[in-house]
Design a protein with these regions (language model features):
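Carbohydrate transferase catalytic cores enriched for Leloir-type hexosyltransferases
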Residues: 1-75, 79-83, 90-440
Length: 440
């Protein structure tokens, strides 16, 4: 019996490609992790997760420590996709039985995708389609732009942003080539496209060509972790000490790359630091492509000794870093969503971000907005973020309200509507929330 044969009314079998999630996930990787966690808690979906070799441990947690087996068997000839028997066996394996009466189906995990990106992309076009045929799923989801050219089942693809098309100068040339082609393929072949914001959906509609149904599904917030209150007294101080961070500080959280405008933040901080001798700047995140400019500017700062580089921040430490910041500055020129900005306001922390961006669309009155590219305006916004006046209290209240309206459970529900649409369900099983037709 394949996953499409599971005899449970209302249950849909969905394949999710998690092979692009790195060991240290940020951005789209965080989205994929949180989405799968939320989907795995639902009783109306049977998940098949494809991951890289050696990455099984991370995804087994979705099934409470024991996902269905997905290795070997007849699928080895198809890049280790696993046979139909493996898929069926996983449906009621460790972690859960059939999805009836509020129970759930344990995810099936296949960990045979190659580690290297070039061979993994080949596997996606050859091994994955063969595995999908054997697994018998109803829908396949590519959460990071890509899908098989000849996908044997209806496909849903997530498009995070259009910077590979509109601003190729912000990315490595090879990534531009790959993701431009992936976005074009998703337009032509995907039954449904998930956009993480209206901002991205509008741009996708204007890129031309055929396009399937668009579902606008925003990211969520883990409110158990991202909140104004510490989990226990002194917990945040311990996390900051491990990172080598002292208060007060302005925080940037994200990959350090050209479109994040970290260079502007460094220059703005140098102006403000003259007036605030105790204030530091924390750059939390790994260097990405094109980070040399940041290093050069950092070396030229008068107050460079007050800039702390933490590198990648482990997931458990992120809420403390956001919560204890004097302000979070997210001056990105363009994003598809801007999850750190949303998590910052969920923690009640003042936010400075870019006007005319998805972050402004997302948080609105909860942030101090600045025009992109203006160092002096950014410095002024940092000064404003330090004032405890009525406007600051209004922004904080607005931020907490915005954050409360975003949950990963709602994100999962929006994806379920896209999956059901792609599978051809038209009987009202999907609530249609977050849907948007092209041009609508």
């Amino acid at each position: 019996m394949s996953r499409s044969d599971l005899p449970v009314p209302g249950l849909i079998s969905v394949s999710v490609d998690a092979t692009a999630v790195p060991e240290r996930p940020v951005g789209a990787g965080r989205y994929t992790l949180e989405l799968l966690r939320a989907l795995a808690r639902r009783p109306d979906v049977a998940l098949t997760v494809w991951c890289r070799q050696g990455d099984r441990h991370r995804w087994e947690a979705l099934a409470g420590g024991g996902g269905g087996a997905g290795g070997g068997g007849a699928g080895a000839a198809a890049g280790g996709a696993g046979g139909a028997g493996g898929a069926a066996g996983g449906a009621g394996g460790a972690g859960g039985a059939g999805a009836t009466g509020g129970s759930r189906v344990a995810p099936v995990i296949f960990d045979r995708a190659p580690l290297a990106r070039p061979t993994r992309l080949v596997w996606e076009q050859v091994g994955l389609p063969a595995g999908l045929r054997r697994a018998g799923v109803a829908v396949h989801h590519g959460p990071h732009y890509t899908m098989p050219v000849r996908c044997p089942v209806p496909a849903v693809v997530t498009v995070h942003d259009l910077t590979f098309v509109e601003h190729p100068e912000w990315h490595e040339r090879t990534k531009v080539l790959v993701f431009r082609q992936a976005i074009a393929l998703a337009r032509r072949r995907a039954s449904a496209v998930v956009c993480v914001s209206d901002f991205t959906a509008r741009r996708l509609q204007h890129t031309g060509g055929a396009l399937g149904r668009i579902f606008v599904v925003p990211h969520g917030v883990d409110h158990g972790r991202f909140r104004p209150e510490e989990p226990r007294p002194g917990a945040d101080a311990g996390e900051l000490a491990r990172l080598g961070v002292r208060t007060p500080y302005v925080l940037f959280l994200g990959t350090i790359e050209p479109r994040k405008a970290v260079a502007d933040l460094l220059r703005a901080f140098d102006l403000v630091a003259d007036e605030e001798p105790d204030l530091g700047l924390v750059l939390a995140g790994e260097p990405g492509w094109g980070g040399n400019q940041v290093e050069e500017i950092l070396a030229s700062l008068v107050h460079r000794d007050r800039v702390v580089r933490t590198g990648y921040v482990p997931e458990p430490a992120v809420p403390a870093l956001l919560r204890q910041a004097a302000a979070v500055c997210y001056p990105a020129l363009e994003e598809g969503f801007g999850l750190p900005a949303l998590e910052a306001v969920a923690c009640g922390t003042p936010l400075v971000t870019t006007a005319g961006s998805v972050m402004a669309e997302l948080v609105g009155a909860a942030a101090i907005l600045v025009e992109p590219g203006s160092v002096r305006a950014l410095a002024g916004a940092l000064r404003q973020s330090r004032r405890l006046d009525p406007a600051a209290h209004r922004r904080r209240a607005a931020g907490l309200a915005v954050a409360r309206s975003h949950t990963w459970e709602a994100c999962a529900a929006g994806h379920m509507a896209a999956y059901r649409y792609a599978a051809g369900w038209r009987d009202g099983d999907g609530d249609g929330s977050g849907e948007q037709r092209p041009g609508g």
